C-alpha cells in the first residue's frame, strides 16, 4: 500500500502539482479497503483457536474413525499434529488475506502438501473437509459486521473463501 502512495506522490511531485481530489479519493478508497482487510484478519486471528478447535470437533463428529484406534488422529501426538496443521493453514490464509495475494499461501504452505500427506498416509479428503469447516467459521466471522466499519465486504468475503478453497483443493 505504501508503494501506491509513494507512486502517486512521486507523480504529483514530478509535475510540481498538489495531489488531485481524484488521487486523494483513490488513496482514501485504498485505505478503507485496507482497513476492511485488517478487520477480517483481526477477527480470524482473534478467534483462531476456536476456529481450529470447533472445525476439528465437527470433522471428528462426521468422521469418528479418525480418532478411533488406528485412525489418523488417534493418539495425542497425532491429534496435536492435526490441530497444528489446521492452524498453519489458517495462519497462511490470513497472510494471503492481508496481502490480497495467494502466493504466500501457495509458496509457503500448499506447495507439496498433498505429497506430504500422501507419504504420511493422511487422508487428503479429511484434511479438505477440515479446511472447508474452517472456511465456514471464518466466513461467518467476516460477515459479522458487529463493531466494524459499515460497508460492503462481499468481495473480501469471497476472496477469503477462495483462499480456503485453494487450500482444500490442494490436499486431495
Swiss-Prot record:
Source organism: Porphyra purpurea
Free-text function comment from the UniProt entry: Light-harvesting photosynthetic bile pigment-protein from the phycobiliprotein complex (phycobilisome, PBS). Phycocyanin is the major phycobiliprotein in the PBS rod.
Binding partners and assembly: Heterodimer of an alpha and a beta subunit, which further assembles into trimers and the trimers into hexamers. The basic functional unit of phycobiliproteins is a ring-shaped hexamer formed from two back-to-back trimers contacting via the alpha chain subunits. The trimers are composed of alpha/beta subunit heterodimers arranged around a three-fold axis of symmetry. The phycoerythrins also contain a gamma subunit which is located in the center of the hexamer.
UniProt record similarity statement: Belongs to the phycobiliprotein family.
Mitochondrion recorded as keyword: no
Membrane spanning stretches: none
Protein's recorded name: C-phycocyanin beta chain
Binding site for (2R,3E)-phycocyanobilin 2: 153
Record membrane topology: Peripheral membrane protein
Gene: cpcB
Keywords: Antenna complex, Bile pigment, Chloroplast, Chromophore, Electron transport, Membrane, Methylation, Photosynthesis, Phycobilisome, Plastid, Thylakoid, Transport
Superkingdom: Eukaryota
Entry-linked InterPro entries: Globin-like_sf, Phycobilisome_asu/bsu, Phycobilisome_asu/bsu_sf, Phycocyanin_b
GO cellular component, one term: phycobilisome
Main location: plastid
GO biological process, alphabetically ordered: photosynthesis
